[in-house]
């Protein structure tokens, strides 16, 4: 049973892999399989706009969600060669949502936290009515009962996690509600039992929260400190060279037009910018269209 929040299907990722250019980043799943159900299972990966954040979120969702069968979808990619391939494949209750989209659908920021909470809760009740007491009013309360009754843990993927922190900075009521929601979901003894993996992605790192201790159990991977996430954050130099060969573009020209970020030992390129050059061949000023581009 596929839901909007709970156990979504794999169509979005399927569509991405059907694109003219898809660069295999499924190696990230080998890392998440390694940290799943360990103390390193809380991940916040922040990167600038247009850096393929949603693609990563869709990939994680397609791989872990019990709502679909993704074996054939992943079989042609790197993760299928890993010993852990079958271990996580479609084995978890996945909750996946994009805060930006929820905010539009909820109509305004004031209702967004209850919109998200109730949206998840209603789908959990639909699927697991028999194990959730009628008095439960929070998504995370329901998750706790479900794990207790079924043993099945959750993978929670939040795209644009920081919208309410970024765009609603003046709205302290909404911020407080949202941070309490995240704490209920991720912080403390009980969440550590029902969460198998949490993956938050957005532009800001958690350390930018004024009340950052609220979520100090998250490992942060940022553009300035990417560590083992580096090769999954953008396109690497090797990947861009390979695309240049395929599309008959001059690598040095691409490189001088686009001075990649240096991350660890990887020169990392913005995927959308590179794809745009490969397909159009136009070296226009890409950044002017992407909004502000500060490194945080």
Protein language model regions, located:
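Phosphate-binding site recognition
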Residues: 1-296
């Amino acid at each position: 049973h596929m839901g909007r929040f709970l156990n979504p299907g794999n169509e979005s990722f399927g569509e991405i892999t059907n694109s003219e250019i898809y660069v295999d980043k499924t190696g990230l799943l080998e890392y998440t399989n390694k940290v799943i159900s360990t103390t390193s299972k809380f991940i916040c990966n922040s990167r600038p706009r247009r850096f393929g954040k949603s693609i990563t979120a869709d990939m994680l969702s397609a791989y872990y969600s019990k709502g679909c069968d993704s074996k054939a979808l992943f079989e042609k990619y790197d993760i299928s060669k890993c010993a852990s391939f079958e271990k996580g494949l479609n084995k978890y209750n996945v909750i996946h949502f994009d805060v930006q989209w929820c905010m539009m659908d909820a109509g305004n920021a004031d209702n967004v936290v209850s919109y998200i909470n109730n949206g998840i809760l209603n789908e959990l009740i639909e699927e697991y009515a028999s194990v959730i007491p009628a008095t439960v009013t929070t998504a995370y309360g329901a998750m706790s009962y479900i794990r207790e009754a079924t043993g099945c843990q959750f993978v929670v993927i939040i795209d644009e996690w920081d919208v309410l922190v970024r765009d609603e900075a003046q709205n302290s009521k909404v911020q407080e509600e949202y941070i309490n929601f995240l704490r209920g979901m991720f912080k403390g003894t009980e969440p550590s039992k029902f969460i198998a993996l949490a993956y938050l992605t957005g532009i800001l790192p958690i350390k930018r929260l004024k009340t950052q201790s609220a979520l100090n159990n998250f490992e942060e991977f940022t553009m300035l400190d990417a560590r083992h996430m580096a090769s999954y954050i953008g396109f690497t130099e090797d990947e861009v060279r390979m695309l240049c060969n395929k599309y008959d573009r001059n690598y040095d020209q691409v490189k001088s037009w686009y001075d990649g970020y240096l991350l660890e030992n990887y020169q990392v390129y913005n995927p959308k910018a590179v794809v745009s050059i490969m397909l159009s061949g136009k070296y226009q000023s890409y950044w002017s269209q992407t909004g502000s581009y500060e490194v945080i």
